[in-house]
A protein has these predicted regions:
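Short, flexible helix/strand-to-coil boundary loops that buttress conserved ligand/catalytic motifs
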Residues: 73, 81, 118, 149, ...
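Short helix-capping/hinge motifs at transmembrane helix termini and TM-loop junctions
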Residues: 96-97, 141, 164-166, 211
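Conserved catalytic core of Hanks-type protein kinase domains
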Residues: 52, 80, 86, 139, ...
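Short linear motifs at protein or domain termini
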Residues: 1-97, 207-232
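Mobile beta-alpha loop/short-helix "lid" or hinge segments that flank ligand
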Residues: 54-60, 152-154, 168-170
Length: 232
């Protein structure tokens, strides 16, 4: 049997993934009893997992009202992507012309996984697209930068889930592929412009899109994540 800390981590990771893949949409209620029932965990364990997500600003915990998936305003969305542009441009400046063949191969594999999921219409596409940016940050070798990027990517998923098309990332597979080529070539001017334009386009596409239906029950939404946690 898993220890309490492991169970907290399992539920935290499952909920975070469901938010990242836009299965749990902004504003979705997160009742401790329903989540605990789905994962076979106590409310205390679920509450701790929700507190970790609240620390990343992915969940809002309201006194006497329970937890919900965070719902950023348009102003917060614009501020988030402005900060993310600065951070990601710093990332690509560090990596420009410094990618090893192994780095390029890893990024290409990430893009291929993204493209396959996109072609099949699977929600994993969103996660793969987001992880592309996380992998770039990881390649910089800074644990602090990596943690910050994970938080920015998670908050971005809320923006895209709230204002974009349902279960979509608005990232372009081809834009990712072109960025890797430019990084490998080492042209800093092109790389800088490409990352700025890429993130600007992601936000613009999100804010131009219509929102979708978000009315499924929490247990139904989390069922595949609970099953994956049990089998893992």
């Amino acid at each position: 049997m898993k220890q309490r800390g492991e169970r907290v981590d399992t539920i935290y990771e499952a909920l975070r993934l469901a938010i990242l893949e836009q299965v749990l949409q902004p504003g979705t209620k997160l009742p401790e009893d329903a989540i605990g029932e789905q994962f076979g965990a106590s409310r205390t364990v679920v509450r701790r997992a929700l507190e970790l997500l609240a620390g990343e600003e992915l969940v809002d915990i309201r006194p006497n009202r329970g937890a919900v998936v965070a719902k950023p305003s348009i102003e917060e969305a614009r501020d988030l992507f402005s900060v993310r542009q600065d951070v990601e441009q710093m990332v690509v400046r560090r990596l420009c012309g410094r990618l090893t063949p192994a780095d390029v191969k890893r990024l290409e594999a990430q893009i291929e996984a993204e493209e396959r999921a996109h072609h099949d219409g699977r929600p994993e596409y969103i996660r793969h697209a987001a992880e592309f940016h996380v992998v770039l940050a990881e390649m910089c070798g800074s644990p602090m930068l990596l943690r910050y990027m994970r938080q920015l990517v998670g908050r971005s998923a809320l923006v895209l889930g709230l204002y974009g098309r349902p279960r979509w990332t608005n990232c372009s597979v081809q834009e990712h592929r072109d960025l890797v080529k430019a990084l490998a070539t080492g042209d800093l001017t092109i790389v800088d412009r490409m990352m700025h334009d890429h993130l600007d386009a992601v936000l613009s596409r999100a804010l131009d899109a219509a929102s979708g239906d978000r009315e499924r029950g929490i247990r139904d939404l989390l069922a595949p994540y609970a099953e994956a946690a049990r089998s893992g």
